[in-house]
Amino acid sequence: MDARQMKIKAAEAALEHVENGMRLGIGTGSTAEEFVRVLAEKVASGFQISGVPTSERTARLCLELGVPLKSLDELPELDLTIDGADEVDGKLRLIKGGGGALLREKIVASASARMIVIADETKVVDVLGAFKLPIEVNPFGQLATRLAIEKVASRLGLTGDIVVRASGDGPFMTDGGHLILDASFGRIPDADALAVELNAIPGVVEHGLFIEMASMAIIAGPEGARTLKAS
């Protein structure tokens, strides 16, 4: 079973948790896109949901495949969000934002009664941090913001490069018009403390640490999908 097949298995298992008539947050990224595809097949058979996308990219795919969408302003309270993750640990703490949609992903997840994470087994880690931590920042004063992040990281014993994410000949811009700094910390032993510190930096719009947000994770491997709950 290759990586894409594992993502499809996770998406199919997550679909079993979606009930007819649900208000559904729909994530961003390669695994979330496989979920959109299996969801679209069910919608085509008469299944009804109202989806709220976490990015313009997800919205385009949903519209292309016939998944009905609403804005979060139209549906400010959601029953469930299904989204991927770049890393997930045993406490269901996540690193997200590899696809650049972390702000909207976190807003939508926070508006949901439950969040189910779907991922392949390569995303499960003992300690977060091998994947670069995305930090969304306002373009204004981004160098000052980066220095503030470096000072916070140093206080917590974290080291590594923090660089502006690029796209083509310029910086990557989020749907909200912000920059993303990718922090290569390697290991983040105290993700909770780092999340609190990053939240206190004025130029930080959002960060990719999702703490106490996921209610369960569906992890796919060669033998099929399994459920992971917080330890």
From Swiss-Prot:
Pathway(s) served: Carbohydrate degradation; pentose phosphate pathway; D-ribose 5-phosphate from D-ribulose 5-phosphate (non-oxidative stage): step 1/1
Pfam families in UniProt: Rib_5-P_isom_A
Catalytic activities: aldehydo-D-ribose 5-phosphate = D-ribulose 5-phosphate
Binding site for substrate: 28-31, 83-86, 96-99, 123
SUPFAM superfamilies in alphabetical order: D-ribose-5-phosphate isomerase (RpiA), lid domain, NagB/RpiA/CoA transferase-like
Swiss-Prot/TrEMBL keywords: Isomerase
Active site annotation, chain numbering: 105 (proton acceptor)
Matches recorded under InterPro entries: NagB/RpiA_transferase-like (IPR037171), Ribose-5P_isomerase (IPR050262), Ribose5P_isomerase_typA_subgr (IPR020672), Ribose5P_isomerase_type_A (IPR004788)
EC numbers on record: 5.3.1.6
Superkingdom of the source species: Bacteria
A single GO molecular function term of this UniProt record: ribose-5-phosphate isomerase activity
Any one GO biological process: pentose-phosphate shunt, non-oxidative branch
Oligomeric form and interacting partners: Homodimer.
HAMAP family according to UniProt: Rib_5P_isom_A
Function: Catalyzes the reversible conversion of ribose-5-phosphate to ribulose 5-phosphate.
Family label: Belongs to the ribose 5-phosphate isomerase family.
PANTHER family: RIBOSE-5-PHOSPHATE ISOMERASE 3, CHLOROPLASTIC-RELATED
Protein name: Ribose-5-phosphate isomerase A
Source organism (scientific name): Sinorhizobium medicae (strain WSM419)
Lineage: Bacteria, Pseudomonadati, Pseudomonadota, Alphaproteobacteria, Hyphomicrobiales
